[in-house]
A protein has these predicted regions:
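Substrate-binding/active-site clefts of carbohydrate-active enzymes
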Residues: 1-75, 106, 123
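Active-site-proximal helices and loops of the catalytic beta/alpha 8
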Residues: 3-10, 14, 71-74, 82-182
Length: 183
């Protein structure tokens, strides 16, 4: 990406320091990443060096993605997007999800924020602490992977009692507004 620019695919001929964090400590994107030995060693998602980990709590990152008038979120919502799906929501800090939802609902009350959560999102534990996805300040709904798993289990075993139990667990655990909008 232009923000990290490890392969130097993006030019900084205007000298504004937009050549990416990998190429310059003066880059306005430098604080978005955590370098351990600049520039070649940095935190990456699951150790994959082509996926540098972004610091979603950095103020300038929050401004760029969420808060600024011309932020990524404002751009797409103003063009008619009605919401967003957060890939790998359990890898995002609570503060990021909460800030995103708060901003979306303030400007676009009918917008929807959906999270990719593979397990039961009502009691998800991620990195040692319970997530608050469905308590009103984060996600509107989630991908319904527990249901998918239950259906596959039924197709493999033919055990209707097991399927019924799994579906009932989802129904019992999810608030009605979430249950009625599962993906």
């Amino acid at each position: 990406s232009i923000y990290f620019n490890r392969k130097r695919r993006y030019d900084d001929s205007d000298g504004k320091g937009e050549n990416g964090a990998y190429n310059s400590r003066n880059s306005k994107y430098y604080r978005w990443y955590s370098f351990t030995s600049y520039p070649d060693k940095y935190e990456s998602w699951w150790g994959i060096d082509t996926l540098p980990k972004v610091n979603e709590e950095d103020e300038s990152y929050l401004d760029f993605i969420i808060r600024d008038e011309d932020s990524v979120i404002n751009h797409w919502l103003s063009l008619g997007a009605s919401g967003f799906r957060l890939d790998v929501a359990d890898e995002l800090p609570d503060i990021f999800i909460e800030e995103l939802r708060k901003h979306m609902k303030a400007r676009y009350p009918d917008s929807v924020l959906i999270g990719e959560v593979w397990e039961d999102a009502s009691n998800k534990i991620s990195y040692g602490y319970r997530r608050k996805y469905l308590q009103g300040s984060q996600l509107d709904s989630v991908m319904n992977y527990p249901f998918k798993k239950a259906i596959i289990g039924y197709m493999e075993t033919g055990d209707a009692k097991l399927l019924s139990g799994e579906v009932e667990t989802i129904r019992e655990n999810y608030p009605p507004q979430v249950l009625n909008s599962l993906m």
